[in-house]
């Protein structure tokens, strides 16, 4: 029987299986798995003799990771899922959510409270803690627009810190936490959510979906339902077909280079970049043009619905999925001269 140490504030497991803790359902094992119930006890838990001094790997819901090998680190999971309104103001509210809360649960809860802002981010897998690391985004919205404070344990300084949105250094699918992965352990996030705001409807089929639902004056909850419908049609359910959502980031190119590429490929979708001098390309389009959509090699494959999504049909290993991803990226580079990189975090391997 594997060793398990239980306290009211945390639980430490030895030789813990991770298959049910990652949405690729990769069979992997953690030498130590630490589950944090009350984050205030985190410093004490980290000094336990079995794990003191070990590097830490935070695993939320495992929805954005590929376990290419057994992690050497102590795997840490926050299981604090409480959510509360800290204060109400005339036009917004401050909301605090525990790092272990499922992101979609927070979206639904905020809508039930009459708050808005997160509706375009409905049904994104993962936890509240992970949302700030990845700066999750969808349908024209990024979470950085609503983050007020991130509460984290700074392993370098040995203390809890409260970082403002600007201090989080958010960028496209990036943040301070992603650039310093071994420093901060996010315990909770505070959000500044408006009571009313201008809905973003002009992105990727939302207006058409609302029309199909016969909604002419949409409210935030209607937008959330439209997004849920769209995502369910486009992306496979990880509980049915194991996956980690979009595996690759959309690449950014200098505007001139993007336009030159479209001259050779007139149907190439191009979107505004983060600056007037850059454009964002559709990684899904590039991959599909290389013939990868729906491909299956053993139990590793690319989803038939969406070329950005790698899938595990059953017993694929993390190494097999990583090898497939590398071949996909190499083919895009060879045909289009464009480098695509993983959005999914690689554990036990480098890109």
Swiss-Prot record:
It is found in: Cytoplasm. NCBIfam families: murB, PRK00046.1, PRK13903.1. Residues 25-196 form the FAD-binding PCMH-type domain. The keyword Nucleotidyltransferase does not apply. Its EC number is 1.3.1.98. The gene is murB. SUPFAM superfamilies: FAD-binding/transporter-associated domain-like, Uridine diphospho-N-Acetylenolpyruvylglucosamine reductase, MurB, C-terminal domain. This is UDP-N-acetylenolpyruvoylglucosamine reductase. The active site is at residues 173, 246, 343. The keyword Phosphoprotein does not apply. It comes from Xylella fastidiosa (strain 9a5c). InterPro entries: FAD-bd_PCMH, FAD-bd_PCMH-like_sf, FAD-bd_PCMH_sub1, FAD-bd_PCMH_sub2, MurB, MurB_C, MurB_C_sf, Oxid_FAD_bind_N.
């Amino acid at each position: 029987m594997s060793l398990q140490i239980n306290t009211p504030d945390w639980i430490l497991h030895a030789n813990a299986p991770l298959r049910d803790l990652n949405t690729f359902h990769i069979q992997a094992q953690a030498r130590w798995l630490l589950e944090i119930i009350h984050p205030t006890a985190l410093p004490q838990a980290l000094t336990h003799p079995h794990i003191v001094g070990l590097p830490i790997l935070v695993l939320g819901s495992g929805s954005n990771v590929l376990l290419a090998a057994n992690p050497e680190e102590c795997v840490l999971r926050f299981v604090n899922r409480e959510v509360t309104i800290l204060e109400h103001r005339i036009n917004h509210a401050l909301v605090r959510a525990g790092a272990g809360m499922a992101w979609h649960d927070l979206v639904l809860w905020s809508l039930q409270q009459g708050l808005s802002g997160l509706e375009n981010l409905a049904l994104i897998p993962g936890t509240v803690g992970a949302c700030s690391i990845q700066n999750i985004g969808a349908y024209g919205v990024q979470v950085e627009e609503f983050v007020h404070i991130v509460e984290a344990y700074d392993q370098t300084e040995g203390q809890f810190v409260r970082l403002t949105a600007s201090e989080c250094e958010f960028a496209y699918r990036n943040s301070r936490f992603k650039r310093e992965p071994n420093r901060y352990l996010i315990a909770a996030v505070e959000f500044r959510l408006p009571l009313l705001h201008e809905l973003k409807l002009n992105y990727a089929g939302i207006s058409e979906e609302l029309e199909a639902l016969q909604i002419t004056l949409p409210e935030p909850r209607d937008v959330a339902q439209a997004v849920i419908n769209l995502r369910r049609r486009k992306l496979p359910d990880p509980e049915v077909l194991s996956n980690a959502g979009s595996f690759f980031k959309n690449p950014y190119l200098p505007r001139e280079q993007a336009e030159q590429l479209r001259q050779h490929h007139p149907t190439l979708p191009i979107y505004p970049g983060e600056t007037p001098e850059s454009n964002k390309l559709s990684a899904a389009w590039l991959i599909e043009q290389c013939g990868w959509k729906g491909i299956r090699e053993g139990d590793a494959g690319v989803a038939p619905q969406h070329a950005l999504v790698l899938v595990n049909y059953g017993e694929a290993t993390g190494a097999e999925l990583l090898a497939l991803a590398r071949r996909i990226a190499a083919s895009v580079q060879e045909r289009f001269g464009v480098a695509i990189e993983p959005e999914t975090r690689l554990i036990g391997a480098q890109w």
